[in-house]
Amino acid sequence: MDGVPEISQPEVKKGESFTYDFVVRDAGLYWYHPHVMSAAQVGFGLYGALLVEDPADGVNVADQVTLVLSDIGFDAKGKLEPADSGGSAGMVFGREGDYVLVNGRRRPVLRARPGAPQRWRIVNAAKSRFFYLDLDGQPFTVIGADGGIQEQSETTDIVLVTPGERVDVIVAPKGKAGAPLTLRAMLYNRGYGSVEYRSVEDVMTIEFTNETPIAAKPISITRELPAPSIDGATPVDVILTLPPMKDNKSEFQVNGVPFWKAKPFAAKLGEKQLWIVKNDSDWDHPFHLHGFFFHVIDEKGQPVRPLALKDTVNVPMKTTVRLLVDFDERPGQWMFHCHILDHADGGLMGTVMVGDGTPKEHTHKQP
């Protein structure tokens, strides 16, 4: 169940339908979107969330909400912004929409009892925008990531959610009726232009009820995750680059070639691999692997904790991140790519062939 044309299944053409019949096994927060002209179709709003709950996750919070964050752009005539606006330069920057949305709405209002804990499951479904979230300085308790509850909860004043990522947080907004809070997307430097030509965005308003405030106790959530060991793991270099423009076109590359010229990586069924993802470009890249979770071992040589099951992780510019992947099952050909979808369409994609099958040919061309 993957849905990548020419790789895992045929595209679903206009007027056609396709039924997925599958067993739900892994709790976590997921989302779905097309893999045909991804940047365009996701930018136009074709996406949704899929929540797989674990009744035994230990999170006893009554108020729960799923927040799908995104953005959308329009041209001067009020029509959806063309997918190729800005040409090759727009692809390199990663096009962001003009209007930030939450569950398809602009600046919605969420009602809260003062001090009452709420569980926010957050999906970043934007094609390029990073959400660097601040709630008027009030704390977030991060309890989980893409693949469910993480090893240990942690408290922070700001949360970064990059495209494709999911984060599970507890908030206990403090305030009073008539004095709302604002959830904002702060400026985050993901590459040239992402700070210079952008502004802080209001995302959502928290309005308080007149109920008596609650003095909630701090919430601590844990999950036993086996300590990852890189012993015996096969090292795999994944080098992300953006060479100088040629013939007025830019292309991102993995290990020196764009997707339309690349050969698949290979993994034996049951093999453990250590992917050494080196970002040699001047842009951050949210790195996403289809079909498998991974553990983020370290970033710039520094261990990453708490442990969490991830399928998307930001690889900052000029930084190396090591990922431990266990290709334990699910043979077949699987995609990996930057989840800034303009970057993916611009060549920053690849596939890994798991098992002994024959890789499929594709007709993806340089845009």
Predicted segments, located by residue:
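Active-site pocket scaffolds in enzymes
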Residues: 1-6, 142-156, 237-367
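Histidine-centered copper-binding motifs that mark active-site loops
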Residues: 1-170, 191, 202-224, 228-246, ...
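Residue-level "contact hotspot" at macromolecular interaction interfaces
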Residues: 11, 111, 160, 174, ...
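Short tyrosine-centred short linear motifs in exposed loops/low-complexity segments
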Residues: 16, 24-30, 115-116, 165, ...
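Short beta-strands and strand-coil junctions in structured, solvent-facing domains, enriched
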Residues: 40, 128-130, 177, 189-193, ...
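Asparagine-centered strand-capping/turn motif at beta-strand->loop junctions
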Residues: 122-126, 173, 277-281
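Hard-cation-handling environments
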Residues: 185-186, 236
